[in-house]
């Protein structure tokens, strides 16, 4: 994202995702007639109403939360939202809010068991995404 939308791309070697031409699925105002047939579409986007700064994450491969297995967990630095995105063959199946925390999510990590963690920029604390008791 740059000004209005954040996006998630499924990377292909040599792929053109439209940087400096479009944001998400939308042509930039300075290039309103952008040619889209040679660009690779994102699998998901969200507007500034949902968040303002995407923080890339990991595909969940842990055992603690079975319903998240295979989901791409990512967050938003400004809102503290963490979502689970499911895709099949490069197309979004679902995108669900997992949790909203009162932190600035600056990075994600994954341990050897596939459990996912995130870091709060303000405190530097590390948190594990876990099932609610």
Protein language model annotation of sequence segments:
Residues 107-133:
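Blade-level signature of beta-propeller repeat domains, shared across WD40, Kelch, NHL, RCC1
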Residues 54, 91-112:
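Conserved blade-ending motifs and adjacent loop-strand segments that build the rim/top face
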Residues 3, 77, 100-103, 121:
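Short beta->alpha linker loops
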Residues 1-95, 132:
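Beta-propeller domain segments
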